[in-house]
């Protein structure tokens, strides 16, 4: 199976502190890989390295087999990034925000395509013409997710994508992620949500203090064992 993303012995230092230490993993095309860890584990640093915003001290980050450092422009055209706190304009409505940010990315999308993306993230039709200042945090997150979908890239990089969503919206999002993978998109998401990661991921990598300390694969039927992952996350053995 083709490899969409790979980290090869990545070591990254920020402000004099080593935040990733010899990290290696790969994401197969059409798979969901969840990088799980607590605050300060190095999750967001990993995403920023794949985006080329950070340069590794050693090792290589590759997208579609190409080094990020050597092919930055092409690689950014192949990836859509959803930051934990997406920048959206509160005085604009959902349509206006999406039109504006898509124009910056030089992506064309008509109203039907935008409505289809907002349908996929379950944003109520009657709210789409309202200013984002009237939205809940979860509703704003849905607009940000729709923007990532409209980029229509083969790879999605998601930083704590369910932050601010209620339990129903989280389940809807996880269903969406699985459907995107089934359509062939490759997804790297970072999260501290053990349950959500087990529900949606084909593979989980566990980061602790910048080191990859565990890996879990989805069985042929069902999902990754939540109890085993939770035990590893907490630093103890599963019962």
Short names for language-model regions:
Residues 59-70, 75:
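Conserved ABC transporter NBD signature motif
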Residues 145:
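Hydrophobic anchor residue at the start of the ABC signature
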Residues 191-192:
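H-loop/switch region of ABC-family ATPase nucleotide-binding domains
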Residues 99, 103, 111-127:
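Conserved ABC ATPase "signature" region
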Residues 156-159:
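Catalytic Walker B motif of ABC-type/P-loop ATPase nucleotide-binding domains
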Residues 36-38:
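The feature captures the beta-strand-to-loop junction immediately N-terminal to the Walker
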């Amino acid at each position: 199976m083709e490899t969409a993303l790979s980290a090869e012995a990545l070591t990254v230092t920020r402000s004099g502190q080593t935040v990733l230490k010899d990290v290696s993993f790969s994401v197969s095309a059409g798979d969901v890989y969840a990088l799980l860890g607590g605050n300060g584990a190095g999750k967001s640093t990993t995403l920023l390295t794949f985006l080329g915003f950070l340069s590794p001290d050693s090792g290589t980050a590759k997208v579609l087999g190409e080094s990020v450092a050597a092919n930055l422009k092409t690689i950014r055209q192949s990836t859509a990034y959803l930051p934990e706190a997406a920048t959206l304009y509160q005085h604009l409505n959902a349509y206006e925000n999406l039109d504006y940010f898509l124009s910056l990315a030089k992506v064309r999308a008509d109203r039907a395509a935008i409505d289809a993306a907002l349908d996929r993230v379950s944003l109520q039709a009657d709210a789409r013409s309202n200013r984002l200042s009237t939205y809940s945090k979860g509703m704003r997150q849905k607009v940000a997710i729709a923007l990532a979908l409209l980029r229509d890239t083969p790879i999605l990089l998601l930083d704590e994508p369910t932050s601010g969503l209620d339990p129903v919206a989280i389940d809807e999002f996880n269903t969406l992620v699985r459907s995107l993978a089934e359509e062939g998109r490759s997804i790297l998401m970072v999260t501290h949500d053990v349950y959500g990661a087990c529900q949606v991921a084909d593979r989980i990598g566990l980061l602790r203090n910048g080191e990859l300390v565990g890996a879990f694969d989805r069985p042929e039927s069902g999902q990754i064992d939540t109890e085993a992952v939770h035990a590893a996350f907490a630093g103890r053995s599963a019962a």
